[in-house]
């Protein structure tokens, strides 16, 4: 499936600050809004590759796009970085490899109050819906050892990637912890949700994604 070349969900690289406001865990970016604050459906997701938390792989997230001319991410002069979806590094998770099915992303961090409990809900959804739906959790700026400890203690089996410097969360304009991103096959945004969801509501969102995917497929035929 050909994906649009205009990556409207992305902004330049800046560091993110983690703050708590009115009980909601927020990630501040320099962008004018956060993902999910406006009607942004049907936009293509930006490409990325992240170290698998279980693999011991080192390095930051690769957010280089495959088309510098069309991408809204600035490509520095002389940049030779391999596009994210073309990396072949052991221990890397490429989001493009998950575009074959509906996809749910979760952005979270350990300083985010009940974010760890929300990852438990994410795990329950993974066990219920995979392999009909792909899932990937992205931890923002925690230590590798801390994330691996949580994975073991909480018996998570879903994939977990590492956003060590916060560049990926800024790329996606993540505005709160947790932020869930729901996408159609092909990596096209359906919708997002920010903040705590109980299991029933989260499962309802995944069911809605599956229903919308079926309807979209029928429309595109």
Predicted regions and their residues:
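N-terminal targeting signals for export/organelle localization
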Residues: 1-81, 215, 219-221
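Extracytoplasmic
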Residues: 43-45, 90, 98-100, 130, ...
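Short, ordered coil/turn segments that flank beta-strands lining enzyme active or ligand-binding pockets
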Residues: 53-54, 88-89, 185
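Sequence contexts marking disulfide-bonded cysteines in secreted/extracellular proteins
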Residues: 65-88, 93-99, 116
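Conserved redox-active cysteine motifs that mediate thiol-disulfide chemistry
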Residues: 99, 107-124
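Thiol/disulfide oxidoreductase modules built on the thioredoxin-like
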Residues: 100, 149-157, 164-217
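Hydrophobic beta-strand anchors of alpha/beta hydrolase catalytic cores
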Residues: 104-105, 135, 180
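Conserved segment of the thioredoxin-like fold in thiol-based oxidoreductases
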Residues: 117-164
């Amino acid at each position: 499936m050909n994906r649009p070349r205009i990556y409207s969900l992305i902004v330049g690289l800046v560091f993110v600050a983690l703050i708590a406001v009115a009980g909601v865990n927020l990630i501040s970016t320099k962008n004018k809004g956060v993902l999910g604050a406006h009607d942004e459906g049907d936009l293509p997701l930006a490409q990325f590759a992240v170290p698998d938390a279980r693999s011991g792989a080192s390095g930051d997230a690769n957010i280089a796009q495959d088309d510098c001319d069309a991408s809204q991410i600035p490509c520095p002069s002389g940049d030779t970085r391999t596009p994210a979806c073309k990396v072949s590094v052991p221990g890397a998770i490429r989001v493009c490899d998950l575009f074959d099915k509906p996809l749910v992303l979760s952005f979270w961090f350990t300083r985010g109050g009940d974010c760890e409990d929300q990852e438990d809900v994410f795990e329950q959804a993974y066990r219920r819906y995979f392999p009909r739906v792909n899932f990937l959790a992205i931890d923002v700026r925690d230590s590798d050892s801390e994330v691996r400890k949580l994975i073991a203690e909480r018996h998570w089996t879903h994939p977990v990637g590492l956003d060590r410097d916060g560049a990926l969360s800024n790329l996606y304009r993540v505005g709160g912890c947790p932020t869930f991103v729901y996408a159609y096959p092909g990596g096209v945004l359906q919708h997002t949700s920010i903040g705590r969801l109980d299991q029933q509501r989260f499962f309802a969102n995944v069911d809605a994604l599956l229903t919308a995917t079926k309807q979209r497929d029928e429309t595109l035929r």
